[in-house]
Amino acid sequence: GAVAQTTPTWFYYDTLALRYLGVGRFNQMYPLASILRHGGKVTLGSDYPVSWIGKDALNPMFNIEMAVTRQQAGNPEVPVQARVSERLSVDQAIRAHTSDAAWQLRLEDQIGTLEVGKLADIVVLDRDPYVSDPYSIHTIKVDYTFSDGRLVYRRP
């Protein structure tokens, strides 16, 4: 099946794109929810170092928030990147960073989900993104990171 690999850092209301593409094509940009509804897969990455948000692009929580809101992280006042119906759920955005990304790399038997026999690459967050205000997801911090089951990072 088809895989759309993109970065949510592009999902902000872009007046230049609207002007150059026109309303019809502008409203067709980034149809991620439609791709998922039709059986495709979506994977998300950072686009670092060329992304407009700089080093924040390296933080998946920024990308997850922008995939969920289709707005600049932490900025609910800016217009929504058309179409609101193309927003991803928190679960879809997390899967796009984990299990679906592993599938795209053909490594789903080794990484991407927590299962016996797979590498234990785990982050422990300070808050649950599933119940957090969507506009605060970018502020969620990583408390611990485990790589292949070993603690490699502990937030000071």
Describe the role of every protein-language-model region.
Residues A2-V131, Y135, I140-D148:
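His/Asp/Glu-enriched, well-ordered alpha-helical/loop segment
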